[in-house]
């Protein structure tokens, strides 16, 4: 009896406590307790979220945090440390040592390794990928790190100059034997852009990694001349590798020893020539490559490449030939005929290509990624013939299409591509300068609803009408044929139709303007016309009914007969590049610019964007993490205030050459932008010379680009520790927009 009374009393006290807490906090729980769902269901639900949303959801409660740390999700997260000191006695490493989490992927960028401690001894068993990029690390430190990484699958060492200057790296046979047992499962080795890499050092790396399938030596100083090889290897056998030079002849010996296991080779940014490729050709039939990367190889010619590809017809699925200037249509024709399983083909800036070679792409039925940007002799007709010419229906295999800066690409060709490539996820149309481009934009919004990445950089004819679809219905229906949508309507007949359809506004006939002689210059006339067009669009937006009335009206009357499609149809869009689209104004951001998944947005050099557009942007796109507003001269401190207050996930912000900004912008950022990692305020002449002094309250801010002028000096504040989503490696040529930030962080 006493026990039951105590239980009842405890229940009453718990109920009273919950009631007191509810009244105190003003929060009333209602509905099911989603935090108490089984872990399997939570993990299944979180699989439908992207990495950024999962990280934010993990901050809701402890149970959701545990769900986001499931092994399935951890495989795609990276712990990235940038411009910090690796010392286990101080933060951030001291904090990580007491963490209960595991870190399967580590990335160190410009990190100075002072005191490793027992960090890798504690977490090394779970580390699968590790990267060192421009780090200050010694040979003993690297050995002490690798000896604990028993689960390592991938090792990347990029531009670590001091490490390879030491010729004693892995010199001890006993240490190499220990590493060989520990690193037996390593499949990928990337030693990129290392100037002092030698044959001996490469031999030791390959010796301690017996299961290598990926070898990446891009950007290394490899000698392909036989005379130099004979100088350092005077003996005929040449068994002892040289400590002074890196030669392809010795690399080919290493490849021959592992030719049955190697599946990926990368010799990009080297002087590889036909003789070297013919040497690899002699390794058939045991050498069966899956991916081959030869980007920016100036000595590469069709003769050597054709000989090598002839031996890889059954297995090669990815071929990267960016900036191979000497490749011709004949080489592309052989690629299309002899590599039927090819899924990725990148031939950016291969200037000798034309429609004759592109038409042969029809033989690549499994092609998923195509990059022919800056191939200026390719036309829209050639692309259509190669991608959709012989297909009986839509091409549902292609996922990425890069056709940037094709001078002869017509709007009609873009429209046809959008109709026949419905499964595109990435569409790069940068540097398109033909008129009527807004018609192409409307068809992109209508047909490519699964896009996640859209690049319209420097497209001169991207306008508010194309972005919003206002008044674009007739043009979309006629595919841009102006003569097809201007019917002759009698005045009396139009009045009768208006009485029957009161929702349709009366359109007065256009009267020719009186004869006037303008004294404006062409630039002044263009400014006046842009202002009048913006005024008309703003008037249309202000007179629109609310959302419910607009939806009802669109059901009763087909709204697309007058208006087209807005960018809000691309609900899955995550990356949008509108750099230097000068005709865009606040109208595009005010009128239905709702992209809930958008993470990266560039409006650089869109000089007509002001605080009104920014106010609408930050409310309709709350997931933005990287925002570029460089040279948006109409922005002021109020715009930065809106950005800092409403974009809670903002990691990277570029305000370069925004001349109206003052120190008040820095104060707003310091107060609200708690997740900011990188800030660029170069050229903001009304700001103080040292903005880091005003941003000391942001402990996560690692990079500040300050200065009254565009200088290259970089100031660092705080330490850099980041968890970011893993991204597939890309070997494409450097993009033309502003440099990307070091990483896209998603969670702290």
Predicted feature residues:
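Leucine-rich repeat
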Residues: 124, 149, 183, 209, ...
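Eukaryotic tandem repeat interaction scaffolds
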Residues: 374-377, 381-391, 396-399, 403-413, ...
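Tandem repeat domain/solenoid detector
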Residues: 275, 298, 302-303, 314-318, ...
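Acidic, serine/threonine- and proline-enriched intrinsically disordered linkers and terminal tails
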Residues: 223-245, 469-569
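CRL adaptor-proximal regions
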Residues: 1-36, 221, 490-537, 541-544, ...
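C-terminal interaction modules of eukaryotic adaptor/scaffold proteins
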Residues: 649-745
């Amino acid at each position: 009896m006493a026990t039951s009374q105590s239980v009842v009393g405890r229940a009453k006290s718990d109920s009273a406590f919950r009631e007191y807490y509810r009244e105190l906090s003003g929060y009333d729980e209602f509905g099911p307790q989603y935090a108490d769902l089984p872990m399997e269901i939570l993990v299944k639900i979180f699989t439908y979220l992207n990495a950024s949303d999962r990280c934010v959801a993990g901050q809701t409660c402890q149970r959701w945090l545990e769900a986001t740390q499931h092994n399935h999700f951890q495989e795609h997260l990276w712990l990235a440390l940038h411009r910090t000191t690796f010392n286990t006695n101080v933060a951030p490493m001291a904090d990580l040592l007491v963490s209960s989490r595991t870190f399967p992927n580590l990335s160190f960028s410009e990190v100075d390794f002072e005191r490793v401690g027992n960090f890798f001894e504690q977490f090394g068993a779970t580390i699968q990928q590790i990267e060192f990029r421009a780090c200050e690390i010694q040979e003993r430190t690297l050995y002490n790190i690798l000896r604990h990484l028993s689960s390592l699958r991938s090792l990347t060492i990029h531009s670590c100059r001091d490490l390879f200057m030491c010729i004693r790296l892995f010199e001890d046979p006993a240490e190499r034997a220990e590493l060989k047992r520990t690193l037996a499962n390593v499949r990928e080795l990337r030693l990129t852009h290392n100037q002092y890499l030698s044959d001996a050092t490469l031999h030791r790396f390959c010796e301690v990694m017996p299961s290598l399938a990926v070898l990446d030596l891009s950007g290394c100083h490899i000698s392909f001349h036989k005379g130099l090889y004979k100088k350092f290897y005077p003996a005929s056998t040449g068994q002892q590798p040289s400590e002074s030079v890196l030669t392809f002849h010795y690399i080919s010996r290493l490849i021959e020893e592992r030719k049955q296991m190697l599946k990926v080779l990368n010799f990009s940014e080297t002087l590889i020539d036909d003789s070297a490729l013919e040497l690899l050709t002699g390794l058939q039939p045991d050498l069966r490559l899956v991916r081959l990367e030869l980007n920016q190889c100036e000595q590469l010619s069709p003769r050597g490449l054709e000989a090598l590809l002839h031996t890889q017809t059954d297995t090669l699925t990815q071929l990267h030939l960016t900036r191979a200037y000497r490749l011709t249509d004949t080489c592309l024709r052989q690629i299309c005929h002899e590599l039927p399983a090819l899924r990725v083909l990148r031939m950016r800036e291969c200037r000798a290509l034309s429609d004759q070679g592109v038409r042969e792409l029809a033989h690549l039925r499994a092609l998923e990624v195509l990059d022919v940007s800056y191939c200026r002799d390719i036309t829209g007709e050639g692309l259509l013939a190669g991608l959709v010419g012989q297909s009986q229906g839509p091409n549902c295999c292609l996922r990425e299409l890069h056709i940037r800066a094709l001078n002869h690409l017509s709007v009609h060709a873009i429209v046809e591509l959008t109709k026949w490539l419905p499964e595109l996820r990435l569409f790069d149309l940068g540097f398109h300068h033909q008129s009527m481009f807004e018609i192409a934009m409307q068809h992109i919004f209508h047909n490519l609803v699964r896009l996640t990445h859209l690049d319209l950089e420097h497209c001169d004819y991207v306008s508010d009408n194309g972005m919003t679809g206002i008044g674009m219905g007739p043009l979309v229906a006629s595919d841009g044929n102006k003569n097809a949508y201007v019917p002759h309507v009698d005045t009396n007949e139009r009045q009768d139709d208006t009485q029957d359809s009161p929702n349709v506004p009366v359109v007065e006939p256009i009267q020719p303007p009186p004869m006037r002689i303008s004294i404006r210059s062409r630039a002044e006339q263009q400014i006046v016309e842009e202002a009048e067009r913006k005024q008309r669009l703003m008037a249309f937006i202000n007179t629109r009914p609310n959302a419910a009335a607009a939806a009802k009206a669109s059901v009763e009357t087909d709204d697309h007969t007058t208006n087209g499609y807005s960018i809000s149809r691309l609900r899955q869009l995550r990356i949008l590049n509108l750099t230097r689209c000068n005709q865009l104004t606040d109208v595009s951001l005010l009128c239905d610019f709702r992209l809930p998944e958008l993470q990266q947005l560039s409006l650089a050099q869109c000089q007509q964007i002001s605080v009104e557009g920014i106010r609408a942007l930050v409310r309709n796109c709350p997931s933005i993490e990287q925002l570029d507003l460089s040279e948006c001269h109409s922005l002021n401190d109020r715009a930065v205030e809106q950005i800092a207050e409403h974009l809670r996930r903002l990691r990277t912000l570029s305000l370069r050459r925004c001349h109206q900004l003052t120190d008040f912008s820095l104060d707003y950022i310091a107060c609200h932008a708690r997740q900011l990692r990188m800030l660029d305020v170069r050229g903001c002449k009304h700001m103080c010379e040292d903005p880091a002094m005003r941003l000391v309250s942001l402990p996560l801010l690692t990079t500040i680009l300050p200065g009254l002028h565009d200088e290259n000096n970089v100031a660092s504040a705080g330490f850099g520790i980041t968890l970011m989503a893993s991204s597939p490696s890309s070997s494409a040529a450097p993009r033309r927009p502003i440099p990307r930030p070091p990483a896209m962080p998603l969670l702290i």
